[in-house]
Amino acid sequence: LSNIHDLEKFCDEYEKVIKELYRVLKPNKYCAILIGDTRRNKMYQPLAFMVMQRFLQNGFFLKEDIIKHQHNCKATGFWVNKSKEANFLLIMHEHLFVFQKIV
């Protein structure tokens, strides 16, 4: 999945995983994913919410959205300079979505 650069195609492929998660997860149990957003052509792309929507469309309920702040990322130094040159903010968080299969 990480080699798919088209976001819609990524979500379509991820949805196959979501359907299998729903199939194998026992009723009233939980599933969690950690996912971040991205940028395409300097524009913010809310990938986490695109994937979250696919979970909801496939029968899961969102129990929690925990925001994880990212510290000491290896590539931060490189992107700090790029963000100043290109006038965009760094993405410094990820979402830990906790879903529940309610039957």
What kind of feature is each model-predicted range?
Residues 1-103:
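Class I S-adenosyl-L-methionine-dependent methyltransferase catalytic core
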